[in-house]
Design a protein with these regions (language model features):
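A cross-family "folded-core" feature that marks the main globular domain of proteins
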Residues: 1-395
C-alpha cells in the first residue's frame, strides 16, 4: 500500500522504534517475515502514536512551519526539510487536495482561505496530536491561566478540565495567527452578522485585552478576531448550558437552525413538546459546527463507517434512515465532507441517549481466570469501544 521497498520499510520501522524509545513511549513495531505488528503499553495514548508517526512527515512539517512562521519561500523550506523543491511541490499539491475539504489551500508560501477555517483546521489537527506534556506545558503559562479565569468570570461558571484544554489549544493557535497580516474575516463576519449586538458577545468583546496573551490586536481586526473566538466558544462545548441558553435566547442564525432541526425531529416523533435542556445544548453544538465550519479530520478510517459497523451495543432501533430524512430537509447538514459523518455519528449517540435516558446501569463480567494482564487488556478494549459514546459513563 505504501509503495515502499522492504529495505525502505525496514529503515522506517527502525527509525520509528528508535524515536519511540528516545521519547520514553511504550511502543514497538515488530517486523516478522511479511507481517507488521504494533505493540503498545497501557499508558500509550492514540495522540502519542499519531504524533510519533507524523513528526517527520513532510506535509505535517509544512503545516507546523506555516503556523509558526506565517509564510515560506520554496527553496528555503526545501533546504530546511532536506528535500528537493520538486518533492516539496508534490507534497504541497497533495496537501492542497486534503485542504480543499476545508475550503483552504497553500499558495505562494501562504495560507489562502477564511481565517476561522485555518484556525479550525489546526485545532482539529493538533487536538489529535498534542501530547499530554505539551498541553500541560501550555496550561501552566500565566497568559493561558488568565484567559481561563477571564472566561470563567464572564460565564459565571467553572470550566471542566477538557474545556480548559480545548480553550488553551485554540488560544495558542490564535496567538500565532495574530502575526499574519490581511487575515480573511469576511466569511465569519457575514455568517455571524446577527450576533455583533449579542449581549454576551459585547461582554466578551470588552474583555478582549485579557485574551490573546495580552497582545494588541491590529487596527481594524478586533471585530473579526473576537467573532472567530466567539464562534469557537459557541460550537465546541466550551460554554456552560445556561450561557448557551442566554445567547440563543436572543435569536440569530444559529437559533434559527436549531429551531428547524428540533421541528424536523418533532415531525419524526423523536421529541415531544418539552425538550430537555442538555438535549437542546447538544443539538445546538451540532448546528453551530455545521453552520460555522467545513471539513473534519476523522480519528480513524473505520469509526464513522456506519454501513459496516453499528456504533452502539444497546440500540434497539436503527435511526440512520430517520437521520437521512431529517438532514435532507436541512441543507446546512449536507456539506459532502467528513464533518457530515462526525455530525451523524454524534446525532445518533444523542438519539440513543434519549431512548435509554433512564440511566440504565449494567454490570459487565470479565473472565479473571486468564490472569491480570489479560483482564486488564480486555477491560481497556471494552472501555475504548464504549467511550466512543460520550453519553456512556464507565465507573
Amino acid at each position: 500500500e505504501t509503495g515502499f521497498s522492504k529495505a525502505t520499510l525496514t529503515k522506517y520501522v527502525t527509525l520509528l522504534n528508535d524515536r519511540a524509545m528516545d521519547s520514553g513511549l511504550e511502543l514497538t513495531i515488530h517486523l516478522e517475515d511479511e507481517n507488521l505488528r504494533l505493540s503498545i503499553g497501557a499508558a500509550t495514548k492514540g495522540r502519542d502514536i499519531r504524533s510519533l508517526f507524523l513528526e517527520n512527515a513532510v506535509k505535517y512539517q509544512i503545516l507546523v512551519y506555516l503556523l509558526y512562521h506565517q509564510q515560506f519561500l520554496a527553496h528555503q523550506l526545501a533546504q530546511e526539510l532536506m528535500i528537493s523543491e520538486a518533492t516539496l511541490g508534490r507534497h504541497l499539491a497533495s496537501l492542497n487536495q486534503i485542504l480543499s475539504e476545508f475550503d483552504l489551500s497553500i499558495q505562494n508560501g501562504r495560507w489562502r482561505g477564511p481565517e476561522h477555517q485555518i484556525r479550525y483546521f489546526y485545532f482539529c489537527l493538533f487536538r489529535k496530536v498534542w501530547s499530554s506534556q505539551e498541553w500541560e506545558g501550555h496550561m501552566q503559562k500565566p497568559e493561558r491561566k488568565q484567559e481561563i479565569a477571564t472566561l470563567e468570570e464572564i460565564c459565571g461558571a467553572s470550566l471542566s478540565s477538557g474545556q480548559k484544554l480545548d480553550l488553551v489549544l485554540w488560544t495558542h493557535i490564535s496567538q500565532q495567527r495574530l502575526r499574519v497580516n490581511a487575515c480573511q474575516f469576511q466569511v465569519i463576519e457575514e455568517k455571524m452578522r446577527g450576533y455583533f449586538d449579542n449581549i454576551f458577545y459585547l461582554r466578551l468583546h470588552r474583555k478582549a485585552p485579557s485574551f490573546f496573551a495580552g497582545q494588541h490586536l491590529p487596527l481594524g481586526t478586533e471585530d473579526g478576531e473576537m467573532m472567530i473566538f466567539f464562534s469557537f466558544l459557541l460550537s465546541h462545548r466550551i460554554l456552560p448550558l445556561h450561557t448557551m441558553e442566554y445567547i440563543l435566547g436572543f435569536g440569530g442564525q444559529l437559533a434559527d437552525l436549531l429551531t428547524q432541526l428540533i421541528q424536523e425531529m418533532k415531525k419524526e416523533e423523536l421529541l415531544g413538546d418539552y425538550t430537555e435542556d442538555h438535549v437542546t445544548y447538544e443539538l445546538s453544538q451540532l448546528c453551530a459546527q455545521v453552520y460555522l465550519y467545513k471539513g473534519y479530520i476523522l480519528q480513524d478510517r473505520y469509526k464513522y463507517q456506519l454501513e459496516n459497523r453499528h456504533p452502539y451495543l444497546l440500540m434497539e432501533h436503527d435511526f440512520r434512515g430517520t437521520a437521512e430524512e431529517i438532514f435532507h430537509a436541512l441543507p446546512a447538514f449536507q456539506h459532502g465532507t467528513d464533518l457530515d459523518k462526525k455530525i451523524l455519528w454524534e446525532w445518533l449517540q444523542l438519539i440513543e441517549y434519549m431512548a435509554e435516558n433512564g440511566g440504565q446501569h449494567m454490570r459487565i463480567g470479565l473472565d479473571l481466570t486468564s490472569g491480570f494482564l489479560v483482564f486488564s487488556r480486555m477491560a481497556a478494549i471494552l472501555k475504548r469501544y464504549l467511550e466512543y459514546n460520550r453519553f456512556i459513563t464507565i465507573e
